[in-house]
From Swiss-Prot:
Name of protein: Pregnancy-associated glycoprotein 2
Intrachain S-S bonds: 99-104, 258-262, 300-333
Gene name of the encoded protein: PAG2
Entry-linked Gene3D superfamilies: 6.10.140.60, Acid Proteases
GO cellular component, one term: extracellular region
GO molecular function, one term: aspartic-type endopeptidase activity
Length: 376
């Protein structure tokens, strides 16, 4: 049965829409270059997202490490924006031309008066993130992702933004479940699905490891050229986040974290891997990593001798080699593992782009599951 489903998805590859993504310098890298990273990190907190009417809280959404962005258009005629395709949130928003925050002066803004298809919904919105906040109002307009057209799409227009000044994108396009969205709005993926934009309600990510170009997000099917072997399917453990159950995390044959099972979010909105601080510290001890300016570093000479970190998910091992989880920046070799999720109600981990670069990922809304396979 698994093979029949796989063949069905591959057969749809001729009908899918593939949108290029570009790898940008992250805010973490920018802050590090300006010696401002420590102050920023001290202000961050991580908790699971929740929704309350027109106020949406995503404290776990920290765009400090967002690297991959793509272009969409809004309005008639189209106005183009660079956005994060984010599996960790469900809202679409861009800055409004009347926004007065400094962040809006360095990003593209939407002008409602220049769009003949724009309609103001009027409801005020507030979205809290771990790394900032936006306030504004809801509008409706035609949104295009490549050849996909989402008519009368609800989206947020920010009038105030805090914490988004140096980020390499204008707005965010959320791909999580509707339960994470602003009340009485339909996320763009669901709107496209309901209008028959694709026959299979799936999207997938291929994230290139090193080059700025070559990464893609695809809608409506799967292109098998981007992965090796077969897709292993993992059921989603709850229906708001793209969250799965993980069996354990091990190094050198010894379970180092998640010994009794835990939850993990697959998150295209961050590059890092986050977990409870105590468990992340255990992993760093096995690396002989030391804390330096709020980040863990190892000897660059020792990287090739480090063992893989193995994530066992649904009975399948997903190893992460040291060349993937250690990043060399100038003469320093830094771990991508970060603590801070212990404030969540579950023993939650966040597997960001560092993990997803190694594994092609398919997000299947209809069957509420995620497929993983080694990326080419």
């Amino acid at each position: 049965m698994k093979w029949l489903v796989l063949l069905g998805l591959v057969a749809l590859s001729e009908c899918i829409v593939i949108l290029p993504l570009k790898k940008m310098k992250t805010l973490r890298e920018t802050l590090r270059e300006k010696n401002l990273l420590n102050n920023f990190l001290e202000e961050q907190a991580y908790r699971l997202s929740k929704n309350d009417s027109k106020i949406t809280i995503h404290p776990l959404r920290n765009y400090l490490d967002t690297a991959y962005v793509g272009n969409i258009t809004i309005g008639t005629p189209p106005q183009e924006f660079r956005v994060v395709f984010d599996t960790g949130s469900a809202n679409l928003w861009v800055p409004c031309i009347t926004c007065t925050s400094p962040a809006c002066y360095t990003h593209k803004t939407f002008n409602p008066q220049n769009s003949s298809s724009f309609r103001e919904v009027g409801s005020p919105i507030t979205i809290f993130y771990g790394s900032g906040i936006i306030q504004g109002f809801l509008g409706s307009d035609t949104v295009r992702i490549g050849n996909l057209v989402s008519p009368e799409q609800s989206f947020g227009l920010s009038l105030e933004e805090y914490g988004f000044d140096s980020l390499p994108f204008d707005g965010i396009l959320g791909l999580a479940f509707p339960a994470m969205g602003i009340e009485d709005t339909i996320p763009i993926f669901d709107n496209l699905w309901s209008h028959g934009a694709f026959s299979e309600p799936v999207f997938a990510f291929y994230l290139n490891t090193n080059k700025p170009e070559g990464s893609v997000v695809m809608f409506g099917g799967v292109d098998h050229r981007y992965y090796k072997g077969e897709l292993n399917w993992i059921p989603v453990s709850q229906t708001s986040h793209w969250q799965i159950s993980m069996n354990n995390i091990s190094m050198n044959g010894t379970v180092t974290a998640c010994s009794c099972g835990c939850e993990a979010l697959l998150d295209t909105g961050t590059s890092m891997i986050y977990g409870p601080t105590k468990l992340v510290t255990n992993i760093h001890k096995l690396m002989n990593a030391r804390l330096e300016n709020s980040e863990y570093v190892v000897s660059c000479d020792a990287v090739k001798t480090l063992p893989p970190v193995i994530f066992n998910i649904n009975g399948i091992d997903y190893p992460l080699r040291p060349q993937a989880y250690i990043i060399k920046i100038q003469n320093s070799c830094r771990s991508v593992f970060q603590g801070g999720t212990e404030n969540s109600s579950l023993n939650t981990w966040i597997l960001g782009d560092i993990f997803l670069r190694q594994y092609f990922s398919v997000f299947d809304r209809k069957n509420r599951r995620i497929g993983l396979a080694p990326a080419v």
